[in-house]
């Protein structure tokens, strides 16, 4: 898939992460945990904005990316899993601890995906974009570990 289309799918993925964090913040009873989940939701929105900047760059410099085609299999799988997670939260099929563990696992997967994408780009701006996304995912994962310890 072209870089622009791949980044568009990645935007949808980050939006789904944000929606899940927001939903989790609404159902947890602990205010500190809720506030942290809201912050994570907003940080996912920041990831969306980074990806939008990447799309704008790719559109203005298409010749830099004409030979790069990236699979969206992992992204599409992540989108489906996040949609399922949000539905499970809405239906109360899982509790907050289970939800945190599920989203934690997805953060690990996409930290790795973002690291792998760095190697696919020679262009420094795109490398920086995926480095920022990977660091954000790592930070989210670390904070989720702390949140699990805060809950009973």
Where are these regions (language model features)?
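Non-heme di-metal
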Residues: 1-152
């Amino acid at each position: 898939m072209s870089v622009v289309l791949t980044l568009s799918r990645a935007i949808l993925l980050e939006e789904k992460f944000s929606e899940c964090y927001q939903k989790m913040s609404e159902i947890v009873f602990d205010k500190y945990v809720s506030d942290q989940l809201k912050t994570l939701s907003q940080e996912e929105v920041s990831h969306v904005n980074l990806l939008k900047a990447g799309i704008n760059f790719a559109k203005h410099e298409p010749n830099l990316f004409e030979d790069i085609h990236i699979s969206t299999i992992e992204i599409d799988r992540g989108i489906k899993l996040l949609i399922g997670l949000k539905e499970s939260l809405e239906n109360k099929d899982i509790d907050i601890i289970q939800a945190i563990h599920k989203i934690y696992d997805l953060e690990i997967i996409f930290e790795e995906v973002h690291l792998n994408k760095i190697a696919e780009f020679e262009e420094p701006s795109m490398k920086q974009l995926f480095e920022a996304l990977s660091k954000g995912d790592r930070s989210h994962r670390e904070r989720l570990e702390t949140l699990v310890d805060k809950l009973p």
